[in-house]
Amino acid sequence: MTKFSLLDHESVPKHEIISEGELKSVLSKYLIEKEQLPKIKVQDPVSKEIGAVVGDVVRITRKSQTAGEADYYRLVIE
């Protein structure tokens, strides 16, 4: 039996854990602290699938009618 991957479903946008360097760039771009980012739980099915741990920041790339694609960032919490 093959395992179903959430990330392969058309309704689930691309999720990926970003590097510390990219995180610094994002935080300086928006003039915010890491703790001010929107949150995603470590128990979220996609968080589990990508191997995210508490403290990671996840970039979610969604389709946008106006921009083509838009990036959203979430801090992984307990």
UniProtKB/Swiss-Prot annotation:
Database matches in Pfam families: RNA_pol_Rpb5_C
GO molecular function: DNA binding; DNA-directed RNA polymerase activity
Gene Ontology biological process terms in this record: DNA-templated transcription
Catalytically driven reaction(s): RNA(n) + a ribonucleoside 5'-triphosphate = RNA(n+1) + diphosphate
Signal peptide (from-to): none
Documented EC number(s): 2.7.7.6
EC category name: transferase
Main localization (coarse): cytoplasm
Keywords, ordered alphabetically: Cytoplasm, DNA-directed RNA polymerase, Nucleotidyltransferase, Transcription, Transferase
Recorded GO CC terms: cytoplasm; DNA-directed RNA polymerase complex
Protein origin, superkingdom: Archaea
InterPro entries: Arch_Rpo5/euc_Rpb5, RNA_pol_subH/Rpb5_C, RNA_pol_subH/Rpb5_CS, RPB5-like_sf
Subcellular location: Cytoplasm
Family in the record: Belongs to the archaeal Rpo5/eukaryotic RPB5 RNA polymerase subunit family.
Subunit and interaction comment: Part of the RNA polymerase complex.
Xref: HAMAP family: RNApol_Rpo5_RPB5
Function: DNA-dependent RNA polymerase (RNAP) catalyzes the transcription of DNA into RNA using the four ribonucleoside triphosphates as substrates.
Name under which the protein is recorded: DNA-directed RNA polymerase subunit Rpo5
Organism, scientific name: Methanosarcina acetivorans (strain ATCC 35395 / DSM 2834 / JCM 12185 / C2A)
